[in-house]
Amino acid sequence: MYFVFSVLITVTLLISAPAYAKPLTFSVEQVFVDEDNHDLRRVGELEFISGISVTSDNKRFGGLSDLHVNPDGQMIAITDKGNRLAAQLVFDRHGSLVGLTNGDITKLQTPKGKKLKGKKKSDAEGLTRTKDGWFVSFEHKQRIWFFPGTDPAVVAATKISPPKGLKDMPANGGLESLVELVDGRLLTFSEDLENAPSQTQGWLRTGKAWENIYLSRS
């Protein structure tokens, strides 16, 4: 006989805003590999530790595209609405993720220091941390920006010279993934642009120079 249960945690997160601002409230629900067997932890080579489903009635929340977790457990995420979400991950004594605290959600800034507006200009998809700041890739209006410092939401973006071929990507199938490699090079892949059938277009940036690379999909 199986017992199905869920743990619902409501966490009130106070954002850095005036006292009259509405608190950012999350509902956090534990998720499992198998809702009928919560002890199932391994699927093939994958070991599942823990997971949560996060919702909020705040209209700014949602559409998380990519995230980075600092060694101290602080999460920095970007959304397809051009927001940066920061929150502290909460773990129980067994090391399972159970909640979020200290949340803040703020619009990213353009190179002119203005907050992003409009879906086509705000669809952030890829995020990667470097020793000097953050690279963020965008769809629709295809581009990569750099945000110096420890928080991408408090500084104006810096434009990055893009690789050739960005205009060939579908509006909603652009630079979906972005990562800085251990040697400092920047790697990015398109979601839908193909060089050949089952061969996804990507680019590798060394210094300020881009080169084409391709990922074959089986």
Model-derived segments and spans:
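Bacterial N-terminal signal peptides
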Residues: 4-15
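Sequence/structural signature of beta-propeller domains
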Residues: 17-218
